[in-house]
Each structure stands twice: as structure tokens, then as C-alpha cells.
A protein has these predicted regions:
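NAD(P)-dependent aldehyde/semialdehyde dehydrogenase
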Residues: 1-126
Length: 126
């Protein structure tokens, strides 16, 4: 709790030109209008909307976030939702996490959804 999103917004500012894509801005404008008409609190940096929401899938131009009170609560939530999570990118000590910068360059032993693909395919016939 109490995270200051200013650091996050500064880090992604280099992507601000995405708002010039007509399909993206249509999504941004639509989602912003729907949320504002519904009196939903948003964080807005003029090209990305941040909405506090525990759901996994956010609309285009929206990023969902969730607060947690302490690290053990976060770890419990991640464990409960592990079937719904494909990849956790973090510098924290979390089971089966991927380091920043490595999510698009997996090792041979890193399996999507933690399923050994070869083992899965070999056991299909059984």
C-alpha cells in the first residue's frame, strides 16, 4: 500500500507516442469515458489509465493494479492464483519468478504455465 506511481509513470513516459495510434486512442477515450461516467477512480498519465482492480485481464489502454499490505499477503495471493498466472516478473524472492528483462528470453527449462511441453506432448498418447 502507499505506492507512488510517479516513478512508474516516468519509466513508461517514453511510450507516450502510442496515444497517436488512432485505434489505441479510441480505446483510451472509450475506457476513460466509461470509467468516469461510472465514478471509478483512475490514475491517468494522458496515454495509460490505471485502475485498481483484482481482475487479470484489462482492456486496451488500461492497466489493472492491486495493493497488498505486506509481502506474505502478496505471496499468498500469487500461490492461490498460480493456475491463472503465466509469468511473474520481479526482483523480489518469489517462487518461479522471472527477472526483469528475461520474460521474453526464457531458458530451455522455463516452461509456459509451468508445464514441461515435451513431457506434456509425450504423455498425450497415454
Amino acid at each position: 500500500e502507499g505506492y507512488n506511481f510517479e516513478t512508474f509513470f516516468k519509466a513508461i513516459f517514453c511510450w507516450k507516442e502510442i496515444i497517436n495510434d488512432h485505434k489505441y486512442i479510441n480505446n483510451y477515450d472509450y475506457n476513460k469515458a466509461v470509467y468516469l461516467m461510472s465514478n471509478i477512480n483512475l490514475l491517468d498519465n494522458e496515454f495509460l489509465l490505471l485502475k485498481e482492480d483484482i481482475n487479470f485481464s484489462s482492456p486496451i489502454s488500461v492497466l489493472f493494479y492491486e495493493y497488498y499490505e505486506n509481502f506474505s499477503d502478496l505471496k499468498k495471493t500469487l500461490e492461490l492464483e498460480k493456475e491463472n498466472i503465466q509469468c511473474i516478473v520481479s526482483s523480489m524472492e518469489i517462487n518461479q519468478k522471472v527477472n526483469f528483462g528475461d520474460s521474453q528470453s526464457p531458458n530451455l527449462w522455463d516452461y509456459a504455465d509451468d508445464v514441461d511441453t515435451l513431457d506434456f506432448l509425450l504423455n498425450l498418447a497415454n
